[in-house]
Amino acid sequence: MDEYSSIYSQPKTPRLKQEGFPDSIGDQHEKALIDENGEEDKKMASTEGTTGDSRSTPLTVSIPTFENVQALPTPMTYTPLSPGNLSMSPIDQSSLNIPKRRSHARLLDDMLSVTQPNQRVVSELIAPANLSPQRVVSLPTVTEEALVNDSVDSDNYTKEPYFPESSSSTEKCDDDIFQGFLLDHWDRPLLWKKVRPIGSGNFSTVLLYELMDQSNPKLKQVAVKRLKYPEELSNVEQINTSLRYKETLSRLENSLTRELQVLKSLNHPCIVKLLGINNPIFVTSKKPLCDLIIKTPRALPPCDMIMSYCPAGDLLAAVMARNGRLEAWLIQRIFTEVVLAVKYLHENSIIHRDLKLENILLKYSFDDINSFRDSPIYCKQNFIELADFGLCKKIENNEMCTARCGSEDYVSPEILMGVPYDGHLSDTWALGVILYSLFEDRLPFDPPPNASARQRSRATSHRIARFDWRWYRLSDYKTNVGKQIVENTLTRKNQRWSINEIYESPFVKTIADTLSFS
């Protein structure tokens, strides 16, 4: 008996019965194996007779193919080879990994142009398709606001005290001459002449206008914020048939009236002023758009807000023009004024929900502010105005918010997680982001300097949720009092400072006590 015969003559392993398989499958496999072995014996014998080397031919391993098996056990997890009728986990379509909204290499002229840079957004409304992919002034979800009635009836709405013919059509709104009314002076229209565009966003355009008669020096130059209507509202004829139209109209109307009512009630040096409107109905009616649709059924009439004008532009553009090199005293002064503005809002039960560098406007350039340091005007004059109240909300005591809104670089982890959040603490989180950015010339949740490709591939929302930030420029400054604010705001909500705690910190309090306008 040769070595191959001795192998095949070994006792066979007992065959075990397997649940769920036909009894004959083992017999078929065994028969196939014996047939193969028989053929292999003949081949090996022939080879051995010619070469004399029994090690030249390896054994053949036979694998059963289970031709007669009709069904296999259900897999525990989904794999690419699983049957097509298995259900898979739903794919998350709401990724917050949105392309970067800015570049440090941008020229100042580009920043001051009409087209603004792309910006990352957190919003539960999709931006209109026919508009540029800039920051979305998102409308709150219906969980925070009630919808209008299913039918639009003129009996349900308030009649406006005065309806100016000059603003009854969109075409007239595009002229270089703009007619508007100061708040509570509806009987005296004023005329302004367009100078140039200032900026543009997904839901508004801002233009600079000059008063034509020069009768009031304070109104010589104003910023006119012109509302853009979403694409869903372009076809007014759908008002009685489209549920989507009614819901979009309701959200826009709620957001617009809330912003106007809040701005009308505010009076603080460091907050932008609402001076007037192109049509009084926008501030006198609870449902101005529905009222105006009845009067002008073919198109929504324009809404132009007359705002105070800040000639030096926004803080982000000014910082980038300096390549991020700001003196410590200047950072401390500007941040103190921002804190004063937010403190005033919170004391009046208003949350902003969109605090960021772009929404802080400068009344004077940095060079002008520096020239004021040794003069009495330095403590008597405010240098910034907080703007863009499109996402603001007046809330009750201990009220929690649910709308996921804001700009992704500045939103708190609880907003990203989609859980109810304290709007006051979401504002103080954003203040921490602002102060860090002024200190470090970078956003705290951007990829770190000299980051690897893997680190850069992580979404900003991922770093925010992990509180993944650190100091770079100020890493060696252990006694910087401003660092204390950042470290106590970019943290968990149960440890996060309130606006009063920020105000009482030495970094803010020492400057605030010297200001006479606050």
Curated annotation (Swiss-Prot):
Basic and acidic residues biased stretches: 16-45
GO cellular component, one term: cell cortex
Phosphoserine found at: S132
Protein name stated in the entry: Serine/threonine-protein kinase PRR1
SMART domains xref list: S_TKc
Region Disordered: start-end pairs: 1-59
InterPro entries: Kinase-like_dom_sf, Prot_kinase_dom, Protein_kinase_ATP_BS, Ser/Thr_kin_YKL116c_prd, Ser/Thr_kinase_AS
UniProt entry tagged with the keyword ATP-binding: yes
Domain Protein kinase: 192-508
GO biological process: negative regulation of conjugation with cellular fusion; negative regulation of transcription by RNA polymerase II; response to pheromone
Function, as annotated: Protein kinase that functions as a regulator in the pheromone-induced mating pathway downstream of mitogen-activated protein kinase (MAPK) FUS3. Diminishes transcriptional induction of genes in response to pheromone signaling.
Lineage top rank: taxon: Eukaryota
Chain positions recorded as ATP binding sites: I198, G199, S200, G201, N202, F203, S204, T205, V206, K225
Location in or out of the cell: Cytoplasm
Positions bearing N-acetylmethionine: M1
Gene: PRR1
Record's signal peptide: none
Active site location: D354 (proton acceptor)
Enzyme class: transferase
